[in-house]
Amino acid sequence: MKYTHEQLEKHSEILAQKVFLTDRLPHFELLLSEVKILAEQSETGSTVVSLERGLLYGGYSLIGPYFHQHNFISVDSSPTSADERGAYNKSKVLDDDFIQVPITTRAPIENTVLDDNIADLVLVPNLVHHIADQHALINEMSRITKPNGKVFVFEPTLRELHQIPDDYLRYTPYGMYEIMRKVGLEPIDTKLNGGPFSAIGYCWLQALEYLPLEQRKETEAWFFNEHWPQLKQWDTQHTQNLVREHTKFPVGFSILAEKIK
């Protein structure tokens, strides 16, 4: 099924406002913008594989609608341990403007049952840190990608422990470069998102969740009305560490790599 520009824009609004809360969680602005760019740039009819976690959203692919002009295959890599938590985020997508694209299949990352060299583009959106077997994941990313095909990875550098116990590690872009290159994936474009001031805001948001409800409401209003706008402004104004060289403080990053073997 094909969707209109208006439908996709409304879907994007749901993701931004209800799912990713991009006004408060700056990590995911980068993810949404890059996915939409990749959808626009990918050749119509090309094969796009998304390795993601759809169980918690009721079995839907959040990014599937953007690839409605492609041969889109989504693989839910949620482990069996996630079954107990179930679709606990489904309420966030219960909206008429959310485009429901069901996950194609659910399979462990060690055995996705996809053919070798099937994908022109492989998407790994916010998944890497939820996979216990990193060796299997990185090899699968390479195995299913066609020679000269592309692999897109989005990962946070700053996150609380979440979806416990299925939260295993945090990469830097440079660590991701190393493991990608070992399986023939050469990074060709990297983007960083956020800075030290949005990191402060993110930590505040996490801390507020530990307060009792009434105190939380009062403190949230104080923080987001009086301080959050200033922190976001500083993040765009002050982008270089003036004390230490070779230092950055992103809250997330994306890498686009090409399969060279």
Mark where each language-model region is:
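Class I SAM-dependent methyltransferase Rossmann-like catalytic core
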Residues: 1-44
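Class I SAM-dependent methyltransferase SAM/SAH-binding core
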Residues: 47-111
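A conserved beta-strand element that flanks and buttresses the S-adenosyl-L-methionine
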Residues: 123
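A short glycine-rich, Lys/Arg-flanked "PGG" loop and its adjoining helix->strand segment in the class I
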Residues: 135-147
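Conserved beta-strand signature within the Rossmann-like core of class I S-adenosyl-L-methionine
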Residues: 149-155
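Acceptor-substrate binding/catalytic loop of class I
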Residues: 159-182, 196-199
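Conserved S-adenosyl-L-methionine
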Residues: 185-196
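A C-terminal cap/extension of S-adenosyl-L-methionine-dependent methyltransferases
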Residues: 198-261
